Amino acid sequence: YYKPAVLLASEAPVRLTNVSSNLYSQPTRLEIDLSRRQVTLYYENMPVKSYPVAVGRPGWETPTGDFQVMQMFQNPIWINPLTGKQISGGHPQNPLGRYWIGFWTNGRDWIGLHGTPDPNSVGRAASHGCIRMHNKDIEELFYLVSLGTIVKVVP
């Protein structure tokens, strides 16, 4: 069971495209390699760019499998799943940073790619299941994917 940070809302929801009815026809996809702690952007099955990431720590492992981007927010609001404390979007202590790309949910909690106020955590197993990225990297990636983009997470 995954209990990642809860994403409440966004101060600026972004819907870049409609989700394609044939998801696998999309030329852009992401592959997250948990053991290498890296996300790679593919375009027409060719690797275009790779970024270092933090992955879920023991007990909070990032789920593996095939997913799709279901949420994209700028300045996401975060609620601590244990205390209920809310941190507004854009706040320097917001653990999601300024960009959120959600790709997994159990109907209540979400897992996605996001920035971090702790750049030293990138490259480690440090999250509650999410994929942390350097803030400059998630900002770049945010504009290279869209709703419906395939996300493959491998061990």
Each language-model region and where it sits:
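N-terminal pre-domains immediately preceding structured catalytic cores
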Residues: 1-155
